[in-house]
């Protein structure tokens, strides 16, 4: 863990604030990587993940952006209402689950709303490398889009395209046309609300884009509860202990109650922290972290949100 001080906070769009962290001991932070995020420990014991958006390679400070979301489980509310300049908070070292691919001919970046934060960091990295890219930034309106004025005058402004729901029709996003015009060497990166990401990714797949060219990061998972959810068992491979997982509890909650600790963070199947190997049984994958190919192997799952299709899952614990 790293203790940091909030050195600056500013409103960058309606309901979006940017926070700047500096190391409390005055030292250097691990360098920023494009696509990386940090875990921020918030008041009330909450831990939330926020992408870094400042210049890749920076070590003097970190910058994150936080949307105050009415559907929040408490994290964004805690940031907006409880954090203030000068306060000390604990953060993790950066982790990168959304990196830029090496050796790519061209990159197509799609950001929806607050999803601009990791995408902005990627754009800065690609511009510094002098690599070919295009950034498409979508938002409901200009006042709800962060960093717009800066993007209009930055060094790579000619690579940026804006798409606002309340703008003229000719500037609205036409994902099908954009994706159809790209060569096979182009890779796609997308971050934003689930519906936005689903539209971009589904359009790409319909046009034959290979999965290894599609890169995504989810900020929040849509509710994934089924009325047909039932109970099932998990068996601990090392001890043979059998635990019942009721319909209204997750595997990680049941394991925790039994004193079996599996690290969790997002609790929504987004971050990959809790991935656990499956020895036997068939998981019901409900996460947004594993790829379709990884899910098809059924040899790992996310106990924070995924369940079981079989009567029992044997876990490598």
From Swiss-Prot:
Annotated pathway: Xenobiotic degradation; vanillyl-alcohol degradation
- UniProt KW Oxidoreductase keyword: yes
Sites binding NAD(+) sit at 105-220
Entry's SUPFAM superfamilies?
A: 2Fe-2S ferredoxin-like, Ferredoxin reductase-like, C-terminal NADP-linked domain, Riboflavin synthase domain-like
Say yes or no: keyword Oxidoreductase present. yes
Cofactor(s) essential for the protein: FMN
Instruction: Name one molecular function that GO assigns to this entry.
Output: 2 iron, 2 sulfur cluster binding
Where do the annotations place [2Fe-2S] cluster binding? 266, 271, 274, 304
The alphabetized UniProt keywords are: 2Fe-2S, Aromatic hydrocarbons catabolism, Electron transport, Flavoprotein, FMN, Iron, Iron-sulfur, Lignin degradation, Metal-binding, NAD, Oxidoreductase, Transport
Taxonomic superkingdom:
Bacteria
Question: Which PROSITE patterns does the entry mention?
Answer: 2FE2S_FER_1, 2FE2S_FER_2, FAD_FR
Domain (FAD-binding FR-type) ranges: 1-101
Sequence ranges assigned to domain 2Fe-2S ferredoxin-type in this UniProt record = 232-317
| EC class name | oxidoreductase
Question: EC number(s) for this protein?
Answer: 1.14.13.-
Tell me which Gene Ontology terms the entry assigns under biological process.
lignin catabolic process
Oligomeric form and interacting partners: This demethylase system consists of two proteins: an oxygenase and an oxygenase reductase.
As for family, the record states: Belongs to the PDR/VanB family.
What's the name of the protein?
Vanillate O-demethylase oxidoreductase
What is this organism's lineage? Answer: Bacteria, Pseudomonadati, Pseudomonadota, Gammaproteobacteria, Pseudomonadales
Q: Gene name on record?
A: vanB
């Amino acid at each position: 863990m790293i203790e940091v001080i909030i050195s600056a906070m500013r409103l960058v769009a309606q309901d979006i604030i940017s926070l700047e962290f500096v190391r409390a001991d005055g030292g250097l932070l691990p360098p920023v990587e494009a696509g990386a995020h940090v875990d921020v420990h918030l008041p009330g014991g909450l831990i939330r993940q926020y992408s870094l958006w400042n210049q890749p390679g920076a070590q003097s400070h970190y910058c994150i952006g936080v949307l105050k979301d009415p559907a929040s489980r408490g994290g964004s509310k805690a940031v907006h209402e409880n954090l203030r300049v000068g306060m000390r908070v604990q953060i993790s070292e950066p982790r990168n689950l959304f990196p830029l691919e090496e050796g790519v001919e061209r990159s197509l970046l799609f950001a929806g709303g607050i999803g601009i934060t990791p995408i902005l960091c990627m754009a800065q990295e690609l511009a510094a490398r002098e690599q070919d890219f295009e950034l498409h930034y979508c938002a409901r309106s200009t006042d709800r889009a962060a960093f717009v004025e800066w993007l209009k005058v930055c060094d790579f402004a000619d690579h940026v395209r804006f798409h606002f729901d309340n703008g003229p029709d000719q500037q609205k996003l036409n994902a099908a046309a954009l994706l159809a015009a790209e060569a096979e060497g182009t890779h796609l990166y997308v971050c934003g609300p689930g519906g936005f990401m689903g539209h971009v990714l589904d359009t790409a797949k319909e046009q034959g884009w290979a999965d290894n060219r599609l890169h995504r990061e989810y900020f929040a998972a849509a509710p994934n509860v089924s009325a047909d959810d039932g109970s099932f068992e998990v068996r601990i491979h090392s001890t043979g202990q059998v635990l019942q997982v009721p319909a209204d509890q997750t595997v990680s909650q049941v394991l925790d109650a039994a004193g079996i600790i599996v690290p969790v963070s997002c609790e929504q199947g987004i971050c990959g922290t809790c991935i656990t190997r499956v020895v036997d049984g068939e998981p019901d994958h409900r996460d947004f972290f594993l790829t379709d190919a990884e899910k098809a192997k059924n040899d790992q799952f996310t106990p924070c949100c995924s369940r079981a299709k079989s009567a029992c899952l044997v876990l490598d614990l």
